């Protein structure tokens, strides 16, 4: 075909001459390549020829037999300028007649082309409607592409839209484990609980993603939330034999007394499912025992009593309970004044006092509760470091004469006492102020 040959040669004059003299139908589709002349020119990236053809009446939204528009072709070729040219000449940014190519927006997202996606969105491309099988926000999450997710959210993509195959965007992001995308979705108003779907914390445990579990707990998600079967995150972690997540949940205050709809506690789950390690069983028992000694409130008295009877009814678990009690008594024996090492579990002891107590500890004597002690010591050292740095910052930066004289006249011990009243965030603010 002469016109196609002229386009291939980028011969604008010949293209114009053929169109005018041969009375060419610009909407005809070539049987060999399934392209119209405009499709062909766009695929070649010849802007001047495309402009001329549009001026001569070529349909900017003409679709070939595969239902692919010129805009789709420009997007697949990552040709930003051509995309903008077609949009400026009336290209439909939501054009889609089948499930193969999707909308131009979906096509741009699949190509992971940020600039083209931005151009389409600025021109009003629809972020909500699902013309094919996936929403644009779902596609961006599947690609693990944070910039595209942010771009879509900025243009109003619905974070609570439902996809029949992938569910809600937040559930998909949790399955993929992208922390930054999860944060973005939560920031933009994700509903924390969907009917017929597990809570976000349950979902993260089902995916065995410790980082996501920690993120959600840090953002205030209830560590003791129940799913439709009454299972808490701890029930689920025990059932799935996830030792690391069991440790996290215990450290974050998971209540082992809660019973599910079948009146089963998480401890009982160890026996019901029969696939759990001795480590999980001992983790639960050790926490149940220390919580009882510390008088930690629980949500279910019946569940607590059931756990206790379950432990004492078995020789091995009862023997382990006695070992736990021995270590607790050792912690109570390590004292300075009225404070004991056991107080670290209740968070009733200042960091400097805790470190003094730790100097009296023979750590190998504590096998069961060693991690609790080590974690408390780490936190105490971190806090002492913050206090020390805050003191240095204040000493170096207070310059006003009146304030300076007042500060210098305060005894060092009192200055440190003042700093000890501050929370972690306040101390960080002081340290980061210079």
Curated annotation (Swiss-Prot):
Task: Keywords in alphabetical order, please.
Answer: ANK repeat, Repeat
Q: Name one GO biological process term.
A: proteolysis
Q: Where are the ANK repeats?
A: 33-62, 66-95, 101-131, 132-161, 165-195, 196-225, 229-258
Give the matching InterPro entries: Ankyrin_rpt, Ankyrin_rpt-contain_sf, Peptidase_A2_cat, PRANC_domain
Q: SMART domains in the record, alphabetically? A: ANK
Please report a single Pfam family linked to this protein.
Answer: Ank
Q: Name one GO molecular function term.
A: aspartic-type endopeptidase activity
The name of this protein is Putative ankyrin repeat protein FPV219
